Every structure is written in structure tokens, then in C-alpha cells.
From Swiss-Prot:
This is Urease subunit alpha. It is an enzyme of class 3 (hydrolase). One of its GO terms (molecular function) is nickel cation binding. GO terms for biological process: urea catabolic process. The keyword Lipoprotein does not apply. CDD domains: Urease_beta (cd00407), Urease_gamma (cd00390). HAMAP family: Urease_beta (MF_01954), Urease_beta_gamma (MF_01955). Residues 1-102 are annotated as: Urease gamma. Its EC number is 3.5.1.5. InterPro entries: Urease_beta-like, Urease_betasu_sf, Urease_gamma-beta_su, Urease_gamma/gamma-beta_su, Urease_gamma_sf, Urease_subunit. Keywords: Hydrolase. Residues 103-238 are annotated as: Urease beta. The gene is ureA. In the N-terminal section; belongs to the urease gamma subunit family.
Length: 238
């Protein structure tokens, strides 16, 4: 017997549906996969029998499972079930919308938000820094990037920004077009303040000694706005 990948998928779906049906008969609450498999397998079988139309099966698919037949939260996870079923006159897509009515219980992962605004970084002291893009390409800086180590074509007082990041919402960014100059608000990086990666100017605990080393590195590597003491002495192995 030679089967196409599509036929193998349908056999697997039928097997999963039968397993789900047996568990339902035993009173076992179905999970997401089992619920979808049971509905899909039933529709395939009824379509193959040829006694019901696609429209009738769409309605029937909403009566197969009740909220108490599935685990808490499963009903809200299944917004629709779509299955390509073989009818006597050809293959048709049967889509069952909201196959299981919600039972009013809490949905796993559901968020309840307050109506008022949320103040980000509340209580953290911010400093304002004027930044200019002296390069010929746009530069975009993410919310948690160590601002001291941003693109070397951004000109600003780098010493003032050591150990700081943008005071903006997580996941957002600030963009500087070529020649653009504007001020940004920065706050201290939280946590244990061990800064690694970025442009490898720090790669250690962010303290005063690290700042001296980082400023020297930045000046050597051509980062605009980096001013290092000409009498710099390597007191710590870099």
C-alpha cells in the first residue's frame, strides 16, 4: 500500500481522533491537540459518508465538545478548526468557528490591565544627553543597549553615558538620521551591572576603573565623543 504524505497525515489525524474519542468516553478531559483531532476526525468521517453537506458539518462541529470535556483554558485556545475533507463531489474546506464555547473560567496567560497609564522606570534618575549622528547612514539604538558603546559615528559625551541605557519602553528604539541632532534621556543599567558584548569596550563590572579603561579603548578605536586621559596607565589587565 503506497500512501501520499497527505494521506499519511489524514491517517495520523484519524488515529489521534479515535484516541481522543476513547479518552472522552472514559471521562478524561481533553487537551488542545486531542480536542482538535476529535473534531477534525469526525468531520472527515461524516464528509466521506456523504450524507451531510459542508455547511451542516460546520454547525455539527460546534456540538461535539462541551467546555467540561476539555481542560481549563483549551476552549479559549481553539478559535477555529479547518479541515480539508473529501465529499462525494470533491474536496472541500470545512471551517468550524468557535468549536467549544468558553465556560467563563480564567484563561491561562490572560492579562487583566488597569485603566490608568503605567509609568516606566519609575523612581530612576535620568540624565539628558545631546547626540548627533555625524555619519552618512541612519543609526537605531535599542532600549537596553549600553549607550556608551553605540555606533562610533554618534557624537556625544560618552563618559556621561557610561553604564546607562535609554529611558524608553523595553523593545523600542531611538533612530538618528544622518546629520540629525537631538537629546535623549538615559538611566542606569540595572541588575549587577556587569556589561559584556556590544562593542567590547567594557566586558567587566561597570565601575570607575572600568570607565577609564573603556574610555581609552573607545578613543583608540575612533568612537566620537570619547575623551581619555593622555596620562592613562593600565592599572588593570585588560
Amino acid at each position: 500500500m503506497k500512501l501520499t504524505p497527505k494521506e499519511l497525515d489524514k491517517l495520523m489525524l484519524h488515529y489521534a481522533g479515535e484516541l481522543a474519542r476513547k479518552r472522552k468516553e472514559k471521562g478524561i478531559k481533553l487537551n488542545y491537540v486531542e480536542a482538535v483531532a476529535l473534531i477534525s476526525a469526525h468531520i472527515m468521517e461524516e464528509a466521506r459518508a456523504g450524507k451531510k453537506t459542508a455547511a451542516e458539518l460546520m454547525q455539527e462541529g460546534r456540538t461535539l465538545l462541551k467546555p467540561d470535556d476539555v481542560m481549563d483554558g483549551v476552549a479559549s485556545m481553539i478559535h477555529e478548526v479547518g479541515i480539508e475533507a473529501m465529499f462525494p463531489d470533491g474536496t472541500k474546506l470545512v471551517t468550524v468557528h468557535t468549536p467549544i464555547e468558553a465556560n467563563g473560567k480564567l484563561v491561562p496567560g490572560e492579562l487583566f490591565l488597569k485603566n490608568e497609564d503605567i509609568t516606566i522606570n519609575e523612581g530612576k534618575k535620568a540624565v539628558s544627553v545631546k547626540v548627533k549622528n555625524v555619519g552618512d547612514r541612519p543609526v537605531q539604538i535599542g532600549s537596553h543597549f549600553h549607550f556608551f558603546e553605540v555606533n562610533r559615528c554618534l557624537d556625544f559625551d560618552r563618559e556621561k553615558t557610561f553604564g546607562k541605557r535609554l529611558d524608553i519602553a523595553s523593545g523600542t528604539a531611538v533612530r538618528f538620521e544622518p546629520g540629525e541632532e537631538k537629546s535623549v534621556e538615559l538611566i542606569d543599567i540595572g541588575g549587577n551591572r556587569r556589561i559584556f558584548g556590544f562593542n567590547a569596550l567594557v566586558d567587566r563590572q561597570a565601575d570607575n576603573e572600568s570607565k577609564k579603561i573603556a574610555l581609552h579603548r573607545a578613543k583608540e578605536r575612533g568612537f566620537h565623543g570619547a575623551k581619555s586621559d593622555d596620562n592613562y596607565v593600565k592599572t588593570i589587565k585588560e
